[in-house]
């Protein structure tokens, strides 16, 4: 029993292999070290001090290393630092499960994951209001399985940067997160079992941000939830004082509805002027290249099943993948002469971007053509 404000310190004085339960042969289960606490408790310091007295290693030494360490500690209000960047199988499994007073999760810097490393880590942490960043781009089996199950305080998911999935990697990840209404994913193809029930029981309406290449017509608790809007994230450049931001977009395989705070234009060259005309019916057809004028630097283009016809005389071309432009191609930029298309000198542009092939009619510091907007 400690008085209010008092502290107790824990540190390992032996190697990880000398500590029962942290050995390389330990397989988890019921016989594991676990804190039991009452009263409001704040954990601090580096959890690696439990396996390394000098806190020099950033590699988890064994499987199940911190399995269930704070499980059912309903009075835990803050978590210790988790500095490891190389993980082992099941190392953080159930670590904070049912820590219902935990408001903020620790940072998770690891980029090399292991099987089930984060499985059920924050499951039923109902006070958690913000999920930690998940920087890893290579998934492994079960790595995030039920990681945030029933975290009812979450409204948005952490960005999911992985472009390819692994079996059960996101299975049940946000299941029963009843207030979750925003997910941003980077993968371009659904995979069997990878997302089983991952968005079961989330908010009835929400936004699912994803690449153009992902199949958006498949809906359900293991894909995009019914009632949610699939959208493409747009980042634009401009001047905040005018609230005018510009970028280009190539719609690839899907059609998109232009929201009210944005205008999409196709382009036709008239002498020294590039005339920009709004797309018909506010729909960017599949395969169309456009200039976007936005009211803010970041916004979303909702996917639509509506149909529209591509412009027959659009001077803009587009690319679905990151590409290097030709020596005489032009890209939209905020250059010395303002917003316009400037010679890009063979530099790359990102995926789903548009460009202007004009054949080198102006130097790099000069706009190829003046721009006029037809409203």
Residue ranges with predicted function:
Residues 1-239:
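Solvent-exposed loop and capping/linker segments of extracellular ligand-binding repeat ectodomains
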Residues 7, 12-54, 60, 234-260, ...:
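A short, polar beta-strand/turn micro-motif
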